[in-house]
């Protein structure tokens, strides 16, 4: 879905990696939370505290999923799922965006 309706958005961004990754929290009418993020070119490692579904909304990422040794490509319109309490890496060569839904 390219449009989120009936939401509240946090004014303050979450800034990571010296400003190279930024996201905003979005609260949906049903009480659930998502984050919308922009990632500048680079390689980054993230950790999860709860399960997540990461949808690529523009551009593409290469992702090193937990317990994997092979990078996988995810482009606009695709997604991948992460369990709680895992680490994963992403890398990209151009600006890319994502929407993270929490499980």
Curated annotation (Swiss-Prot):
Organism of provenance: Shewanella putrefaciens (strain CN-32 / ATCC BAA-453)
Family the entry assigns: Belongs to the nucleoside phosphorylase PpnP family.
EC number in record: 2.4.2.1, 2.4.2.2
GO CC, any one term: cytosol
Pfam assignment, any one: Ppnp
Superkingdom of source: Bacteria
Name the UniProt record assigns to this protein: Pyrimidine/purine nucleoside phosphorylase
UniProt GO MF annotations: guanosine phosphorylase activity; purine-nucleoside phosphorylase activity; thymidine phosphorylase activity; uridine phosphorylase activity
Functional note: Catalyzes the phosphorolysis of diverse nucleosides, yielding D-ribose 1-phosphate and the respective free bases. Can use uridine, adenosine, guanosine, cytidine, thymidine, inosine and xanthosine as substrates. Also catalyzes the reverse reactions.
InterPro entries from the UniProt entry: Ppnp (IPR009664), RmlC-like_jellyroll (IPR014710), RmlC_Cupin_sf (IPR011051)
Keyword Cytoplasm (UniProt): no
UniProt keywords, alphabetically: Glycosyltransferase, Transferase
Catalytic activity: a purine D-ribonucleoside + phosphate = a purine nucleobase + alpha-D-ribose 1-phosphate; adenosine + phosphate = alpha-D-ribose 1-phosphate + adenine; cytidine + phosphate = cytosine + alpha-D-ribose 1-phosphate; guanosine + phosphate = alpha-D-ribose 1-phosphate + guanine
């Amino acid at each position: 879905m390219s449009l989120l309706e009936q939401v509240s958005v946090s004014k303050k961004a979450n800034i990571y990696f010296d400003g190279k990754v930024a996201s905003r929290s979005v609260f949906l009418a049903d009480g659930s939370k998502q984050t919308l993020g922009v990632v500048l070119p680079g390689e980054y490692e993230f950790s999860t505290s709860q399960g997540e579904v990461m949808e690529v909304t523009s551009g593409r990422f290469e992702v090193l999923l937990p317990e994997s040794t092979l990078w996988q490509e995810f482009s606009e319109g695709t997604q991948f799922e992460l369990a709680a309490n895992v680490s994963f890496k992403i890398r990209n060569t151009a600006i890319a965006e994502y929407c993270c839904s929490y499980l």
